[in-house]
Structure formats: C-alpha cells, structure tokens
Amino acid sequence: MLYPLVKKYLFSLDAEDAHEKVCKILRTLSKSSFLCSLIHSQWGYKNPKLENEILGLNFPNPLGLAAGFDKNASMLRALIAFGFGYLEAGTLTNEAQVGNERPRLFRHIEEESLQNAMGFNNYGAVLGARSFNRFAPYKTPIGINLGKNKHIEQAHALEDYKAVLNQCLNIGDYYTFNLSSPNTPNLRDLQNKAFVNELFCMAKEMTHKPLFLKIAPDLEIDDMLEIVNSAIEAGAHGIIATNTTIDKSLVFAPKEMGGLSGKCLTKKSREVFKELAKAFFNKSVLVSVGGISDAKEAYERIKMGASLLQIYSAFIYNGPNLCQNILKDLVKLLQKDGFLSVKEAIGADLR
C-alpha cells in the first residue's frame, strides 16, 4: 500500500496545504465516473448486513465522513468511492467567507489528532449548491452542514440560518445545523433551548427533509440534554454528537485556537454520547462522531445507540483503506455476537 509514503510526504507539509493538495486531486477524480469506479473497486466495501433505511434514506453502511472535509461539496463523487455510506458536505454559510487567519489547521501526531481553527471558510451557499449539482444525483445520502456567517450579529442569527437553508433547499438529503463550532465567535452561545426551539420550528416549516442538530462535547450534561430535548420537541429528527472539543488538556502541546478532534476526543465523545443515548435512544436518530478510528470503537458506539457514525481525523491518519478495514471488521464483530445485521445491533447495550 502506497499510503505510508504519501502520508510521509503530506505530513511534511503544512496541514492545510496538504489538505488542499488532496482536495485538488479529489476534485479532479470526481470529474471521471470511470476513475471513481476504479477507486471503489479497490477501496469500497459492500455487505447487505450493513445496509439500513433511516428516515426514508437508504444507507449502504453506517460510516459517514463528517462535515469539514468537503466544505464546498466539490468532491463528493470521489469521496463516496472510498466506501463511505454517506457524506456530510459543508459547513456552508449564506455568504462566502475566508475564515480565520492561517495557520489554522494543526496536527498532533502522537495523539493522532487534529486541531482546527478554520472558521467556516467556504464559497457560500449559492456556489456550494452549484458545485453539489454538478454531479448529482449521488449513490449515497448526502447531508448539508449549515453555519452562521461570522459578521452576523447574534440577534440576526435565526435569519441567517433561514437564509442559508433557503439557498440549500434543492440540494442534499438532510440538513445539519452547526451551532457547536468553537471557531466562530459566540456561536456556541446559540446552544440554548430558546434559540434551538426557534431554529427547528422555522426549519420544519421550510423543508420536509430530515433535520439534525450537531452539539459540542463541552456542554454540561444536563444543559446538553435540555437543549437536545428542545430540538427534538421543535422538530429535529436527529442529533449528531459531537463536534470538536476546546478541552486543551487532551493533547500535550495544544495551540491557542481551535477545536480538537481525533483519538484525543474518543473518551470524551463516547461519554457524552452515552448520556445522550440513555435519554434519547428510540426518540431520535443518534449519530456518533469523535475519535472513531477502528471497528471496535465503531461497534461500541452502535451498541450504545448510534444508528450512524462519522469519522474525519482517522481518515487523515489512516488513509483510503480505512472505511474498508472498519466495515470488514465490523461485519466480523456483528457475526461474532450473532447479529444478522447492523440494524439489530443498534442500542443493544440499552436493551
């Protein structure tokens, strides 16, 4: 496998420069259905035991790529070819924005973690929608992650989310409202019952597609449960837990700005998800993300109540064979415990 050599080269570069080089290649690959088929024949994996219908969407497997990798929905076709069961594009904002100053993406190699302070850099919802439609329809469900523009005052946040959702109504299979990025000033302050209630009441009037809320891992558990309950009562179909953490004690040499993801987040994200699932399993679709890098951890989250999973940092550290490795081993774990499908295993620890 060539990835160790490729990784060595990429990791010799600035983290964002390396990401941009990879994205350029993936955008080129996305233009060719033949090359995407070739990639899928090498790194894809299909097994009916992993298929599941959730909220009317057919997922070939539960493993998705989290938002932030493909910010402008420009390389979805190539990413699907690597075996993901679904993708989440974005974060898109209503207006284009450049994000925070560089450097703003860092590696913590010993901890197999990343720290990003990107700040929702994207081309804006109009160009994002145009990019999405270039190769639509897609072979797997695609979510659209929506954020607030940095210059928008808190008092006008609801209008801004309404505007970005309106621009994206004709793309994607579900929408995720991102109130939990630590890289937009005061964004996390919107994680409160009143705003979340207004947000989802507004959104459900605009679309019948599934709506998700992505939450931070740094909330007090009681506060998190109250916010999630408010979202569900107002019309949220699912909860994605968790976003990156601002707990800098989790790595040896943290940077001043940015949220941490990867293996350093595994324990914290798992603990938050466990409390979430105890309260809301069977009441909402639960998606677990944060520090998942192998089949064992993926399986644990599924048994804890996750219908779907997302990865990001592990894809950077482990390369294009990661999905295939996780999915193959996940099937073995399901078989070992006597489950006929992944659907049977969801929430097994809660029964």
Swiss-Prot record:
Record's protein name: Dihydroorotate dehydrogenase (quinone)
Keywords: Cell membrane, Flavoprotein, FMN, Membrane, Oxidoreductase, Pyrimidine biosynthesis
Binding site for substrate: K71, N116, A117, M118, G119, F120, N178, N183, N243, T244
Organism: Helicobacter pylori (strain G27)
InterPro entries linked to this entry: Aldolase_TIM, DHO_dehydrogenase, Dihydroorotate_DH_1_2, Dihydroorotate_DH_2, Dihydroorotate_DH_cat, Dihydroorotate_DH_CS
Membrane topology recorded in Swiss-Prot or TrEMBL: Peripheral membrane protein
Annotated pathway: Pyrimidine metabolism; UMP biosynthesis via de novo pathway; orotate from (S)-dihydroorotate (quinone route): step 1/1
Active site: S181
Gene Ontology molecular function terms on file: dihydroorotate dehydrogenase (quinone) activity
Gene3D superfamilies xrefs: Aldolase class I (3.20.20.70)
Catalytic activity from the UniProt record: (S)-dihydroorotate + a quinone = orotate + a quinol
Cofactor: FMN
Family per similarity comment: Belongs to the dihydroorotate dehydrogenase family. Type 2 subfamily.
PROSITE patterns: DHODEHASE_1 (PS00911), DHODEHASE_2 (PS00912)
Gene Ontology biological process terms, A to Z: 'de novo' pyrimidine nucleobase biosynthetic process; 'de novo' UMP biosynthetic process
Locations listed in the record: Cell membrane
GO CC, one annotated term: cytoplasm
Record's subunit section: Monomer.
Gene name per UniProt: pyrD
Binding locations of FMN: A67, G68, F69, D70, K71, T91, N145, N178, K214, T242, G262, G291, Y312, S313
Manner of cofactor binding, per the entry note: Binds 1 FMN per subunit.
Pfam families from the UniProt entry: DHO_dh
